[in-house]
UniProtKB/Swiss-Prot annotation:
Annotated protein name in UniProt: Transcription repressor OFP6
GO annotation, biological process: negative regulation of DNA-templated transcription
Subunit-structure text: Interacts with KNAT1 and KNAT7.
Region (Disordered): 39-60
Extra information: Plants over-expressing OFP6 show flat, thick and cyan leaves, and enhanced apical dormancy.
Source organism: Arabidopsis thaliana (Mouse-ear cress)
Main location: nucleus
Gene: OFP6
Cellular component annotations (GO), alphabetically ordered: nucleus
Stretches assigned to the OVATE domain: 70-129
Length: 159
């Protein structure tokens, strides 16, 4: 039973993100790949920003103050990039356009050109979701609804 539990833990470790330090290419993952029996596909390895608890670099933006590079093997890089971006946005409360651009630049600078299309697609879909949610919130606002209905009434009474 203890052996089975130990194997389960090792399996989990090989799948978990491995942080490398301060945005430097990690080499720890190569140890797992060396002992792994399945061959590593070069197109499935990528690095992305991931939040960290501590940082020594002072900066004005949350993204720059708490991030490390993480290398991960993935069967679905799009989904992993999207989840990582959403996690960064929520954990660091990234709401401004400048901070979102910084996040995109971080992902693009840390990853090979091979993954840039996937990164931009994931970022674009997140951007569209945020924009449509903001537009829906404005349309559903009682102040906006009352103002629009009064303007419509005035328009029809005028003609």
């Amino acid at each position: 039973m203890a052996t089975k539990s130990k194997k389960k833990i090792l399996k989990t470790v090989s799948v978990v993100d491995i942080s490398c330090g301060n945005c430097i290419k990690p080499t720890f993952a190569s140890i797992f790949n060396f002992f792994s029996k399945k061959p590593k596909r070069p197109s499935s390895t990528y690095r992305h920003c991931h939040s960290s608890i501590s940082s020594a670099t002072p900066s004005s933006t949350p993204l720059a103050t708490a991030s490390v590079a993480v290398e991960k093997d993935s069967d679905d890089p799009y989904l992993d990039f999207r989840q990582s971006m959403l996690q960064m946005i929520l954990e660091n409360q990234i709401y401004s356009k400048d901070e979102l651009r910084e996040l995109l630049q971080c992902f693009l600078s840390l990853n090979s050109h091979y993954h840039h299309g996937i990164i931009v697609r994931a970022f674009s879909e997140i951007w569209e979701d945020v924009s449509s949610a903001a537009a829906s919130a404005v349309e559903a606002s009682p102040l906006i609804t009352r103002h629009v209905s009064r303007a419509s009434r005035d328009y029809y009474n005028y003609y």
